[in-house]
Amino acid sequence: MSTILIKNARMRGHQELTDLYIKDGVFAEIGGGLSYPADEIIDVAGKLVSAPFCDAHLHLDAVLSVGKPRYNMSGTLIEGINIWGERMQGLTKETIKKNARDVIKWEVANGSMFLRTHADATEPTGTVVEALLEVREEMKDLVDLQIVAFPQECIFTEKGHTDLMENAMKLGCDAVGGLPYMEYS
């Protein structure tokens, strides 16, 4: 059994500073002036304690890539997609994983524990999807990561993309994304 006592927390809906007693990962009591024996006592000195944040739209496969291989000088989505295609030619699974892990750690440090990322599932080698599935497994004790199979190059505009999307789902992606503004439909 593990216990944590968080002292002097500022919480939404509470006028006064509040204490939180956590027993085996569950809030056992929330109130002022709590005094329980605990394995760990943390005085947060009036800082905000809240439920974790959710970042519902990330592209962890593309993070930390500004200027690689070049800058998007027009600022348009189409140029950005073209640059992504150029970047994919030399992008390794290890680079994707390292960048994703770094950004996940930043997210967690800033209060996010639930993340949804889009993974380029139409990239023909499967590198992106495999990398992010591995990162999800590696980081599962730190964050809840949902992976959306994202058709960066559309589903129906290119032969074989339907199969790539289906494969991404079989490998373990949680949802299917889309690009309705670019898809032939």
Summary of predicted features, one role per range:
Residues G46, H57, G111, L132, ...:
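Conserved, mostly hydrophobic/aromatic
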Residues M1-A51:
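Histidine-rich, glycine-flanked metal-binding segment
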Residues A51, N82-G126:
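Hydrophobic alpha-helical hairpins/lids featuring a short glycine-rich hinge
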Residues M1-S2, A38-D39, A45, N110-M113, ...:
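Short coil/turn connectors at secondary-structure junctions
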Residues G90, T117-S185:
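Metal-coordinating catalytic core of metallo-dependent amide/deamination hydrolases
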Residues L64-I96, G172-A175:
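Active-site gating loops and adjacent loop-to-helix segments of metal-dependent hydrolytic enzymes
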Residues K47-P69:
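Di-metal (Zn2+ and/or Mg2+/Mn2+) metal-binding site signature of metallo-dependent hydrolases
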